[in-house]
Amino acid sequence: MSSFTKEEFDCHILDEGFTAKDILDQKINEVSSSDDKDAFYVADLGDILKKHLRWLKALPRVTPFYAVKCNDSRAIVSTLAATGTGFDCASKTEIQLVQGLGVPPERIIYANPCKQVSQIKYAASSGVQMMTFDSEIELMKVARAHPKAKLVLRIATDDSKAVCRLSVKFGATLKTSRLLLERAKELNIDVIGVSFHVGSGCTDPETFVQAVSDARCVFDMGTEVGFSMYLLDIGGGFPGSEDTKLKFEEITSVINPALDKYFPSDSGVRIIAEPGRYYVASAFTLAVNIIAKKTVWKEQPGSDDEDESNEQTFMYYVNDGVYGSFNCILYDHAHVKALLQKRPKPDEKYYSSSIWGPTCDGLDRIVERCNLPEMHVGDWMLFENMGAYTVAAASTFNGFQRPNIYYVMSRPMWQLMKRIQSHGFPPEVEEQDDGTLPMSCAQESGMDHHSAACASARINV
């Protein structure tokens, strides 16, 4: 169990009745009289802890190894490190981040089947032994650069119903798997298990069943070749928000029987997974400011009366876009929905609108068409469920900086964090509803709080 590290955040415990939305509104109010209305995030670390409790309940046999690539914010990684999760790292830099927070190498899997030789050597020097492969060339690289590695064979799956398909690029077929196991034996490289990934944003839970069945076949092949394999990695693909068609428990209700059938609890096989968006998607809300506006008139045929026959539409330009947080639209096939920071009047008219990012690229469009009341320069829009594959891949194209992140946590979750820090993760903790609970806020960058509203504390996160 990792304790909290030396990377410190000032934390403020708010009085009862304050919520994450209050923190967001407070920040907006603080900058309302300023010209610097930069985009920013509010991220609920308590939501991440609740996700972990939910995981333990829904998949009790499966140890999560958080996919750092999904969101590599230090506060996120540190919070998960404190809960005892493992970490799926894809590069030297991610390994450095995780180990820099005190995570031991046995809680890391280098889950990239195609690695640079220098980074394989770095993994060896840092004590990271578990790593994936799916080709003979990778086997030979590892044999030379890290002969003591504990290899996990990545197999291909049917990910045709996933939002982001991965098996086109990664994974060995069942036929190739036997050849690779035989080659690993010749090279005297230890293969300890099998991994797969059904694709990010999986929409068919039955895909997991077939993949687990295929993994069983490869385990049997390993036994025939002479390996004693003991690790099954079921990858990711778990939803991270409640606006998806397929719910988390719908997936786990299919996975658990498959695991019990093909890898029963007395089989001696350790089971891990690589959830990313599951942990962080719903924890992040992004606030963006309207920096420019354009009115467009769409002429209707058969009339010369502009006021009555022409349709008015609006183009809004905000201070984050597809080169920043909304890269998820291009790379993660995300569909985002703009929410209003101010509640519209009941009789307010709505107009066809589009939302654009701040860069000079015409591709920088966030929402092609939506209905909004007329808004103005200086108004704010909110986007929920923005924690997955957003900040990690954001660039500073055109000189636009990444948004600051402000962290919040409910008092019960804060108290749980303190217990973890002192005594480790308590297995008997139940999920808690934070709907009306007091909130606390940790800052990653420069947010002041009114002293009357909160008590100051310090947490090593």
UniProtKB/Swiss-Prot annotation:
Inhibited by antizymes (AZs) OAZ1, OAZ2 and OAZ3 in response to polyamine levels. AZs inhibit the assembly of the functional homodimer by binding to ODC monomers. Additionally, OAZ1 targets ODC monomers for ubiquitin-independent proteolytic destruction by the 26S proteasome. This is Ornithine decarboxylase. Homodimer. Only the dimer is catalytically active, as the active sites are constructed of residues from both monomers. PROSITE patterns: ODR_DC_2_1, ODR_DC_2_2. The active site is at 360 (proton donor). Pyridoxal 5'-phosphate binds at residues 200, 237, 274-277, 389. Pathway: Amine and polyamine biosynthesis; putrescine biosynthesis via L-ornithine pathway; putrescine from L-ornithine: step 1/1. Keywords: Decarboxylase, Lyase, Phosphoprotein, Polyamine biosynthesis, Pyridoxal phosphate, S-nitrosylation. Belongs to the Orn/Lys/Arg decarboxylase class-II family.
